[in-house]
Every structure is written in C-alpha cells, then in structure tokens.
C-alpha cells in the first residue's frame, strides 16, 4: 500500500466534498475544484475526513492511490487557503505592472510582453520588480509562474531575468585570457 495514500485528509471548516459519477469536487471559500477519480481507487468520506484505498492489490492501484490522495489534498488546501508563487525581476529596466487581468512585462525586448491570466489565477505586483501569482489550483498557479519565468529565465553570467523568489542562481565565472 502507498504510504502517502494511507494518510487520511482532514477537511477544514468551510470545505465540502462531493463524490458523484466518478468525479470528486471540493468546494470552499476560494472556489470549487473537481478531479476525476480513477477506477482503481476508492474514496470514503466519513465525518470530516477523506480516505483513499486501492480497488485491487495491483502496483498500479497502489501508485494511483497515493497520486489521487496528493491531488485531492492540494485541492482541499487550494479552496481553503490558496496557493501562491512569488517571482522577482532582476535586471536594469525590468518591470511588471497589471493591465486589468493581464500582466504587462518589460524585459529588455523591443516590445512589452503581455501575459493573459487564465481563469482562477490572479496576479499582484506589490513593487515593479515583484510578481505574486495566486490561485486555488496549484497546477495552474505553477504553470503560470513557469510561463512568466520562461519569457526571460535567469542568465548564468549576471543573473538577469525572471526568477522565483526562493530560486538560487549559480553564476558562472567569465572567460579569462
């Protein structure tokens, strides 16, 4: 049995779980998320806890049990507290600002980069060189952060570019004669 999958998920106040037609949906103060449940995994909802068990004793069922438990745990956390990723812009003239729901980035190109935010994901710019991406869906928040970083990833000689706030860029030494 999966060690991750064996652990029950405690539902915090304000979170509701519904299982219908092979789809598990979690509703909370920050929205609603749903996830199809694989046929090799059984879900039990008792009081304020969720437990997952494999439908049979195959390796695939054990692996999917842990996967489904982790995905649903992220959904529960997302609809109650939410997820966020912080990005920093490092470089002369690099700045970010919000234009409605879109993010306008000046990253040293001859043009401004406009990044549209998908549904359920919001961006904030506390300063011109900081971006905070928030949302209930962990996968979407991480994907948007990766897309913004991909416009200008940190380069290895000066460290200029868009980086995660907790990212450490290892700088290379320049070529010597």
From Swiss-Prot:
Keyword terms: Ribonucleoprotein, Ribosomal protein, RNA-binding, rRNA-binding
Identification of the protein by name: Large ribosomal subunit protein uL6
Organism field: Cupriavidus necator (strain ATCC 17699 / DSM 428 / KCTC 22496 / NCIMB 10442 / H16 / Stanier 337) (Ralstonia eutropha)
Protein's gene: rplF
Any matching Pfam family: Ribosomal_L6
Gene3D superfamilies cross-referenced by the UniProt entry: Ribosomal protein L6, alpha-beta domain
Any one Gene Ontology cellular component term annotated for this protein: cytosolic large ribosomal subunit
Matches recorded under PANTHER family: 60S/50S RIBOSOMAL PROTEIN L6/L9 (PTHR11655), LARGE RIBOSOMAL SUBUNIT PROTEIN UL6M (PTHR11655:SF14)
InterPro entries registered for this protein in UniProt: Ribosomal_uL6-like (IPR000702), Ribosomal_uL6-like_a/b-dom_sf (IPR036789), Ribosomal_uL6_a/b-dom (IPR020040), Ribosomal_uL6_bac-type (IPR019906), Ribosomal_uL6_CS (IPR002358)
GO molecular function, one term: structural constituent of ribosome
Taxonomic placement: Bacteria, Pseudomonadati, Pseudomonadota, Betaproteobacteria, Burkholderiales
Family classification: Belongs to the universal ribosomal protein uL6 family.
Record note on quaternary structure: Part of the 50S ribosomal subunit.
GO biological-process terms attached to the record: cytoplasmic translation
Protein's job: This protein binds to the 23S rRNA, and is important in its secondary structure. It is located near the subunit interface in the base of the L7/L12 stalk, and near the tRNA binding site of the peptidyltransferase center.
């Amino acid at each position: 049995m999966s060690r991750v999958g064996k652990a029950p998920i405690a539902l915090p106040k304000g979170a509701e779980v519904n299982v219908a037609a092979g789809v598990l949906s979690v509703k909370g103060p920050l929205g609603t998320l749903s996830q199809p449940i694989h046929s090799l995994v059984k879900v039990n909802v008792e009081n304020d806890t969720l437990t997952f068990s494999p439908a049979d004793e195959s390796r695939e069922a054990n692996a999917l049990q842990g996967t489904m438990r982790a995905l649903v745990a992220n959904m529960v956390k997302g609809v109650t507290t939410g997820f966020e990723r912080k990005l920093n812009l490092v470089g002369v003239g690099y700045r970010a600002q919000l234009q409605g729901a879109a993010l306008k980035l000046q990253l040293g190109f001859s043009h401004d980069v406009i990044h549209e935010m998908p549904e359920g994901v919001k961006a904030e710019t506390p300063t011109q060189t900081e971006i905070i991406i928030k949302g209930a869906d962990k996968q979407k928040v991480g994907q948007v952060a990766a897309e913004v970083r991909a416009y200008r990833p940190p380069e290895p000689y000066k460290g200029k570019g868009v980086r995660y706030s907790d990212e450490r860029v290892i700088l290379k030494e320049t070529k010597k004669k």
